[in-house]
Amino acid sequence: RTRAEAAGVLLAMGVLTLAGYLGLGLFATRLAARGFGPRHMYLAGWALNLAALVAIVLRIPGAPLWWCVYGFGAAANILAFTVLNEGFPSALAGRSNTAVNLTMFAGSFAAQWGIGVLADALRAAMALSTADGLRGAFVTVLVMVAAAFAWFLAGWKRYAAPPAVARA
């Protein structure tokens, strides 16, 4: 890939991420009124991320498309604030939102740094190319994301509140 092609993929991924945010903003209330609440939307976005990451790691043809799907699904991460608040009394909403915000920022930094460190370590230890080192690091990310997804699903019934029905 050339730099221009990579830039085009990043632009498309960014546009689709913004489209995901716009879609959540436009349709979340209507979907909640039909029983598809924030937890469901969060799950759907996470499932898209997971499916796209599997496709990327397995080198399923169409990598630019898979990165765009990944970006679109990532928009649902904003719903972590709403989903987390389902498990706390409303008086603690500020604290839980602050905690998830700090965790997201710190986790994003740690993940980006960790992917680079792991990719470099794999390259050095196994004489891999840069692409193969990154692929190995992304396999680790995939395993961690899949484990977190399974944990989220396991706690679904325990923490899920019925979606609030919007009044028209």
What are these regions (language model features)?
Residues 56-57, 138-168:
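Multi-pass alpha-helical transporter architecture, strongest
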Residues 38-54:
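Structural signature of the two symmetry-related core transmembrane helices
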